Amino acid sequence: MTSASNSPESYLSSKTRSSKLDDNYLKELNEDLKLRKQELLEILKPLEDKNNLLFQKLMSNLEEKQRSLQIMRQIMAGKGNDDSSVIELIKEAEEMKQNLERKNKMLRKEMEMLWNKTFNTEEFSDEEKVLQIKNKTDLQDGKAPKTPSSSRKTKNELETLCAEKGKEIRKRLFLPPGKETEENGMGQVSGTSQHHSE
């Protein structure tokens, strides 16, 4: 009987100690999330006008992560030692985790598509500007202007060049180091080569 009366006190003191440690850990995680939020703001600032929707999704995603951390804190604290409320909180945290994982996958795909599109259009417009300047200088030097067929050929070469540069960037951004994909198709997206088994 005496051992039974002593155990709740020792259990509570050890629980208090562990919840303090857990709370410190969760505070560190929260600080880390704030830093990541700030980094995202800086990364996405130049693209903010074009990518407002994506930006909002990323921010709401981070806010959801912070809410899940608050739930974790409540679980760790044991909120009034009521097991049923702790179980409910655990279920809620699990649902939130699965939801966040789904959202993260979708966001990664959207960001990859958006970056590819932005990069390709910017590269293409830069190359066209260079060509226009070159044509003007050729005319001033007395050289014959390019025929429509040759300019079409140049445009195709530019598109090929943009596609290849886009592939290189996708590899650097989304593939783990050392993982090379062998792609010979002109406009092939990296995602399609990875899922060819499906």
From Swiss-Prot:
Comp. bias intervals (Polar residues): 187-198
Coiled-coil segments on the chain, per record: 24-117
UniProt region (Disordered), positions on chain: 135-198
Keyword Coiled coil: yes
Protein keywords: Coiled coil
Domain of life assignment: Eukaryota
Keyword Coiled coil among record annotations: yes
Name under which the protein is recorded: Putative coiled-coil domain-containing protein 196
